[in-house]
Amino acid sequence: MKKISLKTLRKSFNLNKSKEETDFMVVQQPSLASDFGKDDSLFGSCYGKDMASCDINGEDEKGGKNRSKSESLMGTLKRRLSAKQKSKGKAGTPSGSSADEDTFSSSSAPIVFKDVRAQRPIRSTSLRSHHYSPAPWPLRPTNSEETCIKMEVRVKALVHSSSPSPALNGVRKDFHDLQSETTCQEQANSLKSSASHNGDLHLHLDEHVPVVIGLMPQDYIQYTVPLDEGMYPLEGSRSYCLDSSSPMEVSAVPPQVGGRAFPEDESQVDQDLVVAPEIFVDQSVNGLLIGTTGVMLQSPRAGHDDVPPLSPLLPPMQNNQIQRNFSGLTGTEAHVAESMRCHLNFDPNSAPGVARVYDSVQSSGPMVVTSLTEELKKLAKQGWYWGPITRWEAEGKLANVPDGSFLVRDSSDDRYLLSLSFRSHGKTLHTRIEHSNGRFSFYEQPDVEGHTSIVDLIEHSIRDSENGAFCYSRSRLPGSATYPVRLTNPVSRFMQVRSLQYLCRFVIRQYTRIDLIQKLPLPNKMKDYLQEKHY
């Protein structure tokens, strides 16, 4: 029997213990090492390669190999305990330590792994080059209408700014028509905050915010506002204009037989505004105008006796603006007349002569006012009626047309209602249409051959013109020529191809009273265009 000494037993016992510990360390830790190996690409920027692939068992395995065989079990336990304490101390140190000192033990690895994995979303977003804010935007429910309105305000709209300009004009829409007051207030607050951050847009928002939508400045309607016929300087500085085609430049003795005669329209002397440069005033001639042709033309302003007499129905024109209140009517009659005028959608201010007629017939009762209104509505449907155009515009429309062509327009003389412009002997002539006692005529005696309807008067004149001149025209000036009048070719405004903006204005004026145009949600330029002369 072989003898085994106590020393040999101790050595064999120590060897077995060290083998068991080594196996325990090898089997326990590779799971953590493999986990770190899988995330090598994830933590590559945070840790070095040597640290990312470091052996977690480094210190313990080396310690196990270099450990002397004679080391006791208590020494091994003490060494492991000291290694654990040292690893815990190193885990609490800041991240600025070097990679050599950053070694892991089995107890510190889960803690460090948890802290590192918390940084994974930040690393992944930076690798994909997506820039997200760490704090998400606060979400609140918004409907599509509110979003669209806000985008209209931010992108397309031009809102009142501190330095207004004509480019800021456009189609204005009230937020009150689109949203409730609470929504408006919420949008106003959001817009104010956004404007303060941008610095480009300065908004001054109230409860009701006018906003420009749809149109840009280059889309605005470009037009020229014509001067009104009543726009004169002071009374003493008023000048006169004589057109080259005016019949007053021809001197002849009118025939005394064969046909009737009616005076021409003298508004070219009283009311026209263009000053011809070739006309000079000679102080040696008492109130006479000398033209380049040498014809002496007497001015109606030379003396008060030369002014043509007023119509017996119409009072003289006042300087102040006439109020449309039907003061001549009282009670129910005034209400009936006003309601009928509004129902027929006719404004007396649309024509200078019409306004005078309305004032003059107030005392005749509501039936006369209603009858005249209906007659003027009927007149507006005729193609040969051109509305409030000047005599110069009428001459332009009658240029290069044959004799017998004519049109009817509003008179430029405030004392009369309508004028007739016609062609005769290659010239464009003008005459007034008289209105007295509810009858219309070309003569100073409307009771003889007057018509209660303007349309009937023109149609009767066209029928009479088929057999020749139905009357003759002469000027009030002595020695002026007489021209035969034939109305055979009415010049219709419907034959012209009008612009789209004109047609839009025409439709709006058909369905909107002129006194309500200022209340439309439109820019001021469009309102001015709608209130211009509509023919």
From Swiss-Prot:
Coiled coil: none annotated. The keyword Zinc does not apply. GO terms for cellular component: cytoplasm; cytosol; immunological synapse. Residues 80-105 are annotated as: Disordered. Residues 384-491 form the SH2 domain. Pfam families: SH2 (PF00017), SOCS_box (PF07525). Residues 80-89 have a biased composition (Basic residues). SMART domains: SH2, SOCS, SOCS_box. GO terms for molecular function: signaling adaptor activity. Residues 486-535 form the SOCS box domain. Keywords: Growth regulation, SH2 domain, Signal transduction inhibitor, Ubl conjugation pathway. One of its GO terms (biological process) is regulation of growth. CDD domains: SH2_SOCS6, SOCS_SOCS6. Pathway: Protein modification; protein ubiquitination. Interacts with RBCK1. Interacts with phosphorylated IRS4. Interacts with PIM3. Interacts with KIT (phosphorylated). The SOCS box domain mediates the interaction with the Elongin BC complex, an adapter module in different E3 ubiquitin ligase complexes. SOCS family proteins form part of a classical negative feedback system that regulates cytokine signal transduction. May be a substrate recognition component of a SCF-like ECS (Elongin BC-CUL2/5-SOCS-box protein) E3 ubiquitin-protein ligase complex which mediates the ubiquitination and subsequent proteasomal degradation of target proteins. Regulates KIT degradation by ubiquitination of the tyrosine-phosphorylated receptor. This is Suppressor of cytokine signaling 6. The lineage of its organism: Eukaryota, Metazoa, Chordata, Craniata, Vertebrata.
